[in-house]
Amino acid sequence: MGVSKIESTQASTYIDDIHDKVTRASNVIVPLSPISVFAARSPWARLEHKSFDEIAHWLKETRKVDMYPARMTILEANQKGEIDDAYVEQFFQQWLNDTALKIPRENAAQYGRNALKLETLETPTDIKSQLEALVSDLNEQVKFESENTVPLKSTYILDEKNERLIDTVDYHTIKWCKLYIDDAQSGWTMPNRDKGLFYAWRRLVAYDPALTKDQRARLKSLPNEAEDLMQQALSYLNISEADAQTYLENHLLSLPGWAGMMLWQDEHNHKVHDLLFSYLAIRIAMEWAIVEPYLPVSQPEDLNDMNKEELIASWIQWGNFSMQSWKALSIEAQQAHIQFAYRFNEQFCRKLWLDAWEATYNQQLKAMIGPKSSVEAEQQSQTLVQMAFCIDVRSEPFRKHIEANGPFETIGIAGFFGLPIEKAELGKKYSHPSLPVMNQPQHKIKEYTHEHEPNAFQQRKHALESVTYTFKKMKQNVLPSLLLPELSGPWLSLQMFTRSFIPKSVGSVIRKFYTSWLKKPNDTALTLNYEPQHQHNHRHIHLEDDLPVGFTDEEKVNYALQALKLMDLTDDFAPLVVMCGHGSQSANNPYAASLDCGACGGAASGFNAKVLAQLCNLPEVRQGLLQEGVAIPETTIFAAAEHQTSIDTLTWIYVPKLTEAARNAYENIEAAMPKISYQANKKRLSQLPNNNLTNRNPNHEVYRLTNDWSEIRPEWGLAKNAAFIIGQRELTKQSDLAGRAFLHNYNWKNDENGTILENIIAGPALVAQWINLQYYASTVAPHYYGSGSKTTQSVTAGIGVMQGNASDLLTGLPWQSVMSADNKMYHSPIRLVVVIQAPQAFISRLLENDETFKQKVMHGWVRLASVDEDNHWHEWSNEVKKFS
């Protein structure tokens, strides 16, 4: 693409409130956490003040990123019966009725119906010359308005090799980010790293051999302070104050992964300050230094120009116009028809198809859920075990198998169990926030042993860490690295052979090693009681913050009461109540954290389950609960377990002394668990692409998959998630939800003021929405919001993955998490529908009180339906507008 010269513009331009503009610009990205604590986030979480469709249009215009499902994805879903054609016609007619048309309705209807077939537009070669002449005449007589954008200078300036200079800017940006962010992976760290990114870059860039002498000189001429440097570079690039924020946004959107990591560091690492500002200052300075020889330039006039030839051709193909009938239209009519086609483009067609897809799923879900049989009440009174599972969609089919195999009741609640804690596990160097990422921990709970001297577990743990540390240091140093292959070669070769050909056996050996040689002491305990800071020294836990350790007596009762109310368990207690966290097992999987509990910030949630179970067993807590109207029988015992989602087993992590009734219940669930696991694994294996695995023993096969380091898909994770159902279990117990629904228990009759519902919406429902939109984004725009194929990923700097050595830090899910084969989707990219079992008055009150949730529904980021007290289904997408 050529560029045209304009007059020199290196006059000084000062942009007011540049820090505020950077802060506002950062809303176009989201923080990207290190992959070891991968937590699902909606890539559009900070843009929900605008509608889904507005952001889709904006991204298409500015980044060429499509937020709607692809044409082939829609056609495949339609063929599979996931989209009802009647809804497509319904939404099209509704749009025609609501739109002020400037062309005859019959023309619009005919064009629209043909365009909605999503057929490829083909322009006959014999009319191309006539189209060119028509467009030439139109351009002389009519001025068509196009989008007003502020693209980066480097996106439309080409170098001598006819390559865009933005690629060079990205290359240098990535290089400096990798050097700075490096998480103790390299033996020789970036000089001056401890003084901040900008300071280190400023000292080193003058010696960068990848830059030309002139480029280094230009950078050296810029000011030494980040703000002054950014101001000067923007001035040299001729960016006005009015365009500054948009220009900053485009820089952030060029590499949203690396920018997101800088933003995450700003928000979570107290050792850094203004890291995102430094990132932008460096990037803009690099851009100016690279494009300066080509300045001054003007933006090409055709950058955002509509393709009028194609639009006229679309009327000939889909509007059944001939060239003669088109020419017979007046200039004004031609302009109106072109504008209609420009608006009713393929992206808009796919938007209507998405609406129809979601409406079809709503209708299917409506038909599945409803009142249950009268036998339910009798079964409830005979329940032996009540098991509270995370709302995770993988829990739903597992819960169904449990309920079918005995007098067992299951309950849904977010996996952090309402506990705002940071956990410090025995043997771990660092603590981890074990709650949704949008919340901050209020307490630290530590796991410790009663022994005051270092015990065998600690010694063995340190010994293993020493071996790993020594191996790493030998790799990083020049002389020892020459000797390392001779020493480690035979052992690593043996490991490679065994893990490749007998993964299940090797995995079994490794598990036995960790469960025996590295088994935690039996006397481990949790710091549930509040402790002053000076008592922490003997715990052998590194503290990174000043959070209070443990709970006060009042807090213990409050958190236990809150959790029991959230799961609607305040009476009719079974002899055994089990809090079930969940985690996942897989080998050689950088995305292992994405398979753990999203409500615990990308970590297994068994720790939270154990904390709550122990709280509920404390006599003083039960006494406090009794004063609040919750009477737990003396025969009821709380225990904790962890659901391993990749092998569908239940691992007990806390079983106190049991009463006779609780012991009987425990033995019943233990006896049923092998059959439950077998059934659950068989069902889950049948859904994997290589479904001939079900011909083998399911339990053996899942262990092989989780231990095979070449396995790209040990489980489907949360793929196909589509609904968040808030209501009693009776609403869904007899329904086959196909592992697509988050299930949270709720009884509106016990929530007179609506506080419980508001808490569910503000916490668990938000987590579910973020998970849903991350899967959605990774499916519809895998090149931008996904992370490519697992087989070609490389873990970078210990904090994320890249494709190759010069890509963005990838933000989303790998291809194997959402697709079952090339060009064949597995995840259905539809937006989450929240279904609430409550009277309409409850929903109205929720929308009036919760402005954030109302905005999500109104702007199309989440859908809302309800089931009232008479089991009638209500859609709220249009009703919500009444509350604005």
From Swiss-Prot:
GO molecular function ontology, one term from the record: zinc ion binding
InterPro entries: DabA (IPR018752)
GO cellular component: plasma membrane
Predominant localisation class: membrane
Assigned keywords, A-Z: Cell membrane, Membrane, Metal-binding, Transport, Zinc
Record's bilayer topology term: Peripheral membrane protein
Quaternary structure annotation from Swiss-Prot or TrEMBL: Forms a complex with DabB.
Protein name: Probable inorganic carbon transporter subunit DabA
Gene from which this protein is expressed: dabA
